């Protein structure tokens, strides 16, 4: 039994839709963050919120506490 034209057309249309949707998906790369140790933060970094506030005074948008050896230091973050 040969496939009908309607069946072949439907299969072709379905295949075309699948190919078109795959072509439309693109992966968005996440922005890289650069870290720089804060020059103004004093003492051990316990709160990333306090670190971020100090980093904002240094013209960075954000900051976080990171382990540096045995001590925790404040590192300021920005998009590279």
From Swiss-Prot:
Domain of life: Eukaryota
Protein name as catalogued: Defensin-like protein CAL1
Signal peptide (residue range): 1-31
Pfam families: Gamma-thionin
Cysteine pairings via disulfide bonds: 34-80, 45-65, 51-74, 55-76
Gene Ontology cellular-component terms listed: extracellular space
Induction of expression: Induced by cadmium in roots. Down-regulated by cold stress.
Tissue: Expressed preferentially in root exodermis and xylem parenchyma cells in vasculature of root and flag leaf sheath.
Organism, scientific name: Oryza sativa subsp. japonica
Keywords: Cadmium, Disulfide bond, Metal-binding, Secreted, Signal
Annotated family: Belongs to the DEFL family.
GO molecular function: metal ion binding; metal ion sequestering activity
Cell compartment(s), UniProt: Secreted, Extracellular space
SUPFAM superfamilies per UniProt: Scorpion toxin-like
Function: Plant defensin-like protein involved in accumulation of cadmium (Cd) in rice leaves. Mediates Cd efflux from cytosol into extracellular spaces via chelation. This drives Cd secretion from xylem parenchyma cells into the xylem vessels, hence lowering Cd levels in cytosol meanwhile promoting Cd translocation from roots to shoots.
Primary location group: secreted
GO biological process: cellular detoxification of cadmium ion; defense response
Application of this enzyme or protein: Rice varieties with high CAL1 activity over-accumulate cadmium (Cd) in rice straws, but are not affected by Cd accumulation, or the accumulation of other essential metals in rice grains. These functional characteristics could be used to breed dual-function rice varieties that produce safe grains while remediating paddy soils.
The UniProt record lists the keyword Secreted: yes
């Amino acid at each position: 039994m040969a496939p009908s034209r309607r069946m072949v057309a439907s299969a072709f249309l379905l295949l075309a839709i699948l190919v078109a949707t795959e072509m439309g998906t693109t992966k968005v790369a996440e922005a890289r963050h650069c870290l720089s140790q804060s020059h103004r933060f004093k003492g051990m970094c316990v709160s990333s919120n306090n670190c971020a506030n100090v980093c904002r005074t240094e013209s960075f948008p954000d900051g976080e506490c990171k382990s540096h050896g045995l001590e925790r230091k404040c590192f300021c973050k920005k998009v590279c």
